[in-house]
């Protein structure tokens, strides 16, 4: 009498890396939910408090400006990251000599590499612009003081309202440039614009043009920094008085002006 034994199904143990990925994703989702609940609770509390004062419009004005500026910062920094990543891609056909494994991963996950990563970088480095909403609102509602400084002949309101906005814009531009350089380096490394040959670093023509353009933008930003530093002198705090000293006006100011012009040239 023959007996037939049913083959037993092999039980596969779950992959450890897969389980760890699920656990990490669960923690991230829970953290996002908790953070969202805290934000909603704080917003609701503030709305109720401002409503009691019959000034809820003030609250929505603050939040509206914060959200708008945060979105602008995110899009500018994220857009700079995306643009430089796309510019570093190899347009002509043929094989590349960059990091093939990483390049293939980026090509297999285009939404993550070309959209998700730039947006994440923009959220981290650009969205904090939202915290400077007061600076921009004050600038939009500025009024002249009717008195000018003795050195540059600018109305005092320029130093109170306009100069902080210019510094904020310059700071955001520097962040965008730093992100651009980082993504350009990564992109050219992936697509063969930057490679090693015989122990030395070789830059393709497109990489040289790309980095040269970024260097030119950096020089312009340096010139802007030196130019704004001229006005910052009048706001300096010295040991005995506030404002620019004799040395600042007669020695430092001409030197900074020359540095600003030299950075552009």
Describe the role of every protein-language-model region:
Residues 3-48, 53-154, 163, 167-265:
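Contiguous transmembrane helix-bundle modules in multi-pass membrane proteins
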């Amino acid at each position: 009498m023959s007996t037939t034994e049913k083959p037993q199904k092999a039980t596969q143990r779950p992959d450890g890396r897969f389980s760890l990925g699920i656990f990490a994703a669960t923690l991230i989702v829970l953290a996002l939910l908790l953070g969202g609940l805290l934000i909603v609770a704080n917003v609701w509390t503030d709305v109720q408090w401002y409503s009691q004062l019959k000034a809820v419009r003030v609250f929505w004005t603050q939040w509206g400006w914060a959200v708008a500026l945060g979105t602008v910062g995110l899009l500018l920094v994220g857009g700079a990251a995306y643009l430089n990543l796309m510019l570093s891609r190899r347009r002509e056909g043929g094989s590349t000599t960059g990091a093939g494994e990483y390049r293939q991963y980026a090509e297999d996950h285009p939404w993550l590499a070309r959209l998700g990563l730039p947006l994440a970088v923009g959220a981290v480095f650009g969205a904090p612009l939202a915290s400077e909403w007061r600076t921009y609102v004050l600038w939009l509602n500025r009024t002249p003081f009717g008195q000018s400084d003795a050195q540059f002949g600018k109305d005092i309101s320029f130093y109170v309202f306009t100069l902080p906005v210019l510094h904020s814009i310059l700071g955001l531009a520097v962040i965008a440039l730093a992100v651009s350089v980082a993504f350009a380096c990564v992109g050219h490394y992936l697509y063969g614009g930057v490679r090693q040959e015989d122990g030395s670093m070789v830059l393709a023509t497109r990489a040289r043009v790309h980095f040269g353009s970024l260097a030119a933008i950096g020089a312009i930003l340096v010139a802007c920094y030196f130019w704004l530093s001229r006005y910052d002198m009048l706001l300096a705090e010295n040991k005995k008085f506030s404002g620019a000293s004799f040395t600042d006006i007669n020695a430092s100011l001409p030197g900074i002006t020359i540095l600003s012009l030299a950075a552009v040239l």
